[in-house]
Amino acid sequence: MSFEGGHGGSRCRGAESGDAEPPPQPPPPPPPTPPPGEPAPVPAAPRYLPPLPASPETPERAAGPSEPLGEVAPRCRGADELPPPPLPLQPAGQEVAAAGDSGEGPRRLPEAAAAKGGPGESEAGAGGERERRGAGDQPETRSVCSSRSSSSGGGDQRAGHQHQHHQPICKICFQGAEQGELLNPCRCDGSVRYTHQLCLLKWISERGSWTCELCCYRYHVIAIKMKQPCQWQSISITLVEKVQMIAVILGSLFLIASVTWLLWSAFSPYAVWQRKDILFQICYGMYGFMDLVCIGLIVHEGAAVYRVFKRWRAVNLHWDVLNYDKATDIEESSRGESSTSRTLWLPLTALRNRNLVHPTQLTSPRFQCGYVLLHLFNRMRPHEDLSEDNSSGEVVMRVTSV
């Protein structure tokens, strides 16, 4: 047995006993092949090891079998082995160039690989660059994509809003034509131009005015027919209106009874003894005075009752709203018609002059008699009361929704 010593370690060889050389180490396994479509992995750089010093030739070594080429004898690390010297620092460009010249392809930048090699080398270089970047760039990529998607989503929303603004909508319920036919009943233009007929009728009944609150144009509303008695709806009235109605009703009943009794006492042959009695003559004077008071009460409170009747009539009539006609509007303006008077007496004058009411509706004696009496009582009111009503410019038709 002979021992050969060297600077980097010791090597054992059994020349005398005929021991064979130790078996060579198996070659390292090949790197795993990446699936198609993914970049090739970057192999790790080989660790730096200093070269072993050449050992002197000995007779045993010369007599022994020759070692095959390409095999490296195993090294035994000892205490005398020195650590590898540190690598010298090189600029980034030189390091990349040196790596490219030495055959270490994975350290090549994508630009250099694309300029130097084919598409395979550029893909490998791009894959190595992505691996060297690591997972730190993924949030940035996602944020860019998310910002692009959010910006595209915001653009779609703005486009949707602009498309909605171009569609005509009702200025009362803010719905489109799918809820009903849209009308143009007044001079308003733009986004407040159109409205549904049912929405406008409900707004007129609740607001109590035939005019538009924006352009002050009187709607062309016509009465079609009265509802059936089973479809009549009640309206809400205030306490003052209730007192006024009760006073007018009681005054009317007392006036009718008093006038009837006075006429019977004056012309009946069976009341001769009453006309001669002094007590009945005093009663005649008192009844005459009370009749005058009742007439004044009815005239004073008749307008309030008339307004309540108009409200009830507006609720229990079928109305139709006409579209705005510019030619008619110009013609009415040229004639100098007062919108206040037309608005105040619209249900009476407009319907009679244009013959828009059905012959069987509101023209029968049972409706016409009371309607004309209330109208006459309202005309007999003092002028200051009429001026107060005309100053408002609206039909008092305040009706709550039922």
UniProtKB/Swiss-Prot annotation:
Residue span of motif PDZ-binding: 399-402
Short motif YXXL motif, span: 371-374
EC numbers for this chain: 2.3.2.27
Reaction catalyzed: S-ubiquitinyl-[E2 ubiquitin-conjugating enzyme]-L-cysteine + [acceptor protein]-L-lysine = [E2 ubiquitin-conjugating enzyme]-L-cysteine + N(6)-ubiquitinyl-[acceptor protein]-L-lysine
PROSITE patterns xrefs: ZF_RING_CH (PS51292)
Residue ranges of the TM segments: 245-265, 278-298
Positions of the UniProt region annotated as Disordered: 1-161
Biased composition range(s): Gly residues: 1-11
Single Gene Ontology BP annotation: protein ubiquitination
Membrane topology classification: Multi-pass membrane protein
Residues binding Zn(2+) 1: C170, C173, H196, C199
Subunit structure of this chain's protein: Interacts (YXXL motif) with AP1M1. Interacts (via PDZ-binding motif) with LIN7A. Interacts with unidentified fucose glycoproteins.
PANTHER family: E3 UBIQUITIN-PROTEIN LIGASE MARCH4-LIKE, E3 UBIQUITIN-PROTEIN LIGASE MARCHF11
Domain notes for this protein: The RING-CH-type zinc finger domain is required for E3 ligase activity.
Name of protein: E3 ubiquitin-protein ligase MARCHF11
